[in-house]
């Protein structure tokens, strides 16, 4: 028999406290939180209402015009007595299917609920992984999101990758989302004259220039995207390439050319970011006034809209205004599905305005490479943890990126320090980990992805074995009263899931918001997120612990649950006796039941 809880708002019930916007600038540890009291009413179902009037009586004296509420005999929830025959007919005759990721389905069949990975994996697609077979290998290996870096490649090349990923989803049963990364207006190197890379050796002199070349450029010469580069830089400045992967010292300026001595050798990649330091401080000069979204970026964004990408990651975000401007543009021009906007936190401005940027965005990326070129290296770990915590508090997915397994670009096994770095990001409960050069141009992209997957699974299992249920309070974020109810339902569902040791949380959601609220709580069990649209299903594939399904459903939870149980049991993903908690953004309810 199920136990069902639904929420009403009687006049004596205190309202949730909403955290004022001004509080977002305070450290999380200094904020006090207030819990919404939850009363469990056994074997009873109460409709949610936004009215402030007392809830109706629950005894037999209720109005005779109201349909009687009964517990369903198969233990799957409450159903009106005059609707039971309709529900039975619907369940019996409904033959529509359910869509789930092929790899996840296999994991559930073979190893059960606890085998599923909670941390999501993102792969940057490049020359090493752009073929259909290579993309399929990544999807089989656990790739949840394919990232396209618009710093590299032509739009035609990116279009081909997008269509290959879409074909992979349609033909092979995956739900790989697509993220497009804008180049941004910061200083970048050119394309290295068509070469895939170049090696800078210690003691070599290289020329960085703003000149354009009609023919082949001289040896060891690199073009720079910023016209004011030669004017802003001074002799003695330190030039960092790609967040410090290669370092130069400025030794001479000759007109538009800047001669630099290589002091830390390394690999130079096309379109790599450039920063320069003077007396231990980052030199910003006029490049600080460059727009966040360049004219090229707007053309790339139009391309992304036309191709129907799922996310657009914005580089070098300085303020929330940029995010809001882009979201308005997308809302006016995107066709059908909503495109999520991810803010890349990779500059001093991003950290200064962190809370307002994350609040405005649909997620954030900790771009540690470029961030480490703008703040001292020893501050990067603390910055990462702060960004992850703020994203979690504000219910925004967070991606930890850059140099996770950098050595695997050239070597088949990672360093032990890299494994420890990955495990720390998993312990921080980040939503996703991202490969960059490891998958785009590395020699071992599949092995790098395998390392991310296996380390994530092991650390997550260790967390559960140690019963490290989190006691960190989460601030209230709902603005409307309905949102506050949904938030408390999800908080309660996650806590109940941990305390009762349930096998899975089922979330029926049209927009994906309620699934994200459950994910925010990081319950021990997997979260089955059922949604009606393919685009929402793909976007949910970025968030921690969510297994997104596409399923047509109604506002009748009895019908939805019976249909879901039937379909999942027929495919071997659940079995009779499994304990499940179900929540819905249609009825704002919690139901606890065993699979019949």
UniProtKB/Swiss-Prot annotation:
Keyword check for ATP-binding: yes
GO BP, sorted A to Z: lipid metabolic process; seed maturation
EC number(s) per entry: 2.7.1.40
KO phenotype (gene knockout): Reduced plastidial pyruvate kinase activity and altered seed oil content leading to wrinkled seeds, retarded embryo elongation and reduced seed germination.
Keywords linked to the UniProt accession: ATP-binding, Chloroplast, Glycolysis, Kinase, Magnesium, Metal-binding, Nucleotide-binding, Plastid, Potassium, Pyruvate, Transferase, Transit peptide
Catalytic reaction annotation: pyruvate + ATP = phosphoenolpyruvate + ADP + H(+)
Listed pathway(s): Carbohydrate degradation; glycolysis; pyruvate from D-glyceraldehyde 3-phosphate: step 5/5
Entry binding sites for ATP: 149-152
Localization in the cell: Plastid, Chloroplast stroma
Binding site for K(+): 149, 181-182
Span of chain positions assigned to the transit peptide in the UniProt entry: 1-87
Any Pfam family matching the protein: PK
Protein family (similarity comment): Belongs to the pyruvate kinase family.
Protein name per the record: Plastidial pyruvate kinase 1, chloroplastic
Gene source species: Arabidopsis thaliana
Gene symbol of the encoding locus: PKP1
């Amino acid at each position: 028999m199920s136990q069902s809880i639904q929420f009403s708002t009687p006049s004596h019930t205190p309202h949730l406290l909403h955290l004022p916007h001004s509080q977002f600038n305070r450290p999380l540890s200094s904020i006090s939180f207030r819990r919404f009291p939850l009363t469990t009413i056994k074997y009873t179902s109460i409709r949610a209402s936004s009215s402030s009037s007392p809830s109706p009586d629950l005894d037999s004296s209720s109005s005779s015009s109201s349909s009687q509420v009964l517990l369903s005999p198969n233990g799957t929830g409450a159903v009106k007595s005059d609707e039971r025959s309709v529900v039975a007919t619907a369940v019996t005759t409904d033959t529509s299917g359910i869509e789930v990721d092929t790899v996840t389905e296999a994991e559930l069949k073979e190893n059960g609920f606890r085998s599923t990975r909670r941390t999501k994996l993102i792969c940057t697609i490049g020359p090493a992984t752009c073929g259909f077979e290579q993309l399929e290998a990544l999807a089989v290996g656990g790739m949840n999101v394919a990232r396209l870096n618009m710093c590299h490649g032509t739009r035609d090349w990116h279009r081909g990758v997008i269509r290959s990923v879409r074909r992979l989803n349609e033909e092979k049963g995956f739900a790989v989302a697509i993220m497009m990364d804008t180049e941004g207006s910061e200083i970048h190197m050119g394309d290295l004259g068509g070469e895939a890379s170049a090696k800078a050796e210690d003691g070599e002199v290289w020329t960085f220039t703003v000149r354009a070349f009609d023919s082949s450029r001289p040896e060891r010469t690199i073009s720079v995207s910023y016209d004011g580069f030669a004017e802003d830089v001074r002799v003695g400045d330190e030039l960092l390439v790609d967040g410090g992967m290669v370092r130069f010292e400025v030794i001479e300026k000759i007109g538009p050319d800047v001669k630099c001595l290589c002091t830390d050798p390394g690999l130079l990649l096309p379109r790599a970011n450039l920063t320069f330091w003077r007396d231990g401080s980052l030199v910003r000069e006029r490049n600080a006034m460059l727009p966040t979204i360049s004219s090229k970026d707007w053309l790339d964004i139009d391309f992304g809209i036309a191709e129907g990408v799922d996310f657009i990651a914005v580089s070098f975000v300085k303020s929330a205004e940029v995010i809001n401007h882009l979201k308005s543009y997308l809302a006016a021009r995107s066709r059908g599905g909503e495109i999520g906007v991810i803010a890349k936190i990779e500059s001093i401005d991003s950290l200064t305005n962190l809370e307002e940027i994350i609040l405005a965005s649909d997620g954030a990326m900790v771009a540690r490479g470029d961030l480490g070129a703008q703040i001292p290296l020893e501050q990067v770990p603390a910055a990462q943890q702060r960004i992850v915590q703020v994203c979690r508090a504000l219910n925004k997915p967070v991606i930890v990126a850059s140099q996770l397994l950098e050595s695997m670009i050239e070597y088949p096994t990672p360093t032990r320090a890299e494994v420890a770095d990955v495990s720390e990001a998993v312990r921080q409960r980040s939503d996703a980990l991202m490969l960059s050069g490891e998958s785009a141009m590395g020699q071992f992209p599949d092995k790098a992805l395998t390392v991310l997957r296996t380390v994530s699974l092991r650390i997550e299992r260790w967390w559960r074995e140690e019963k490290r249920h989190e006691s960190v309070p989460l601030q209230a974020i709902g603005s409307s009263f309905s949102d506050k109810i949904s938030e408390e339902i999800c908080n309660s569902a996650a806590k109940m899931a941990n305390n009762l040791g349930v096998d899975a949380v089922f979330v029926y959601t049209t927009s994906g918001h309620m699934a994200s609220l459950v994910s925010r709580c990081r319950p021990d069990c997997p979260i089955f997120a059922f949604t009606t649209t393919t685009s929402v299903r793909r976007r949910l594939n970025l968030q921690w612990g969510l297994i997104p399904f596409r399923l047509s459903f109604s506002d009748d939870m009895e019908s939805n649950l019976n249909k879901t149980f039937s379909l999942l049991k027929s495919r071997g993903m659940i079995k009779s006796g499994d304990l499940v908690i179900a929540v819905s953004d249609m009825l704002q309810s919690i139901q606890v039941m065993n699979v019949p």
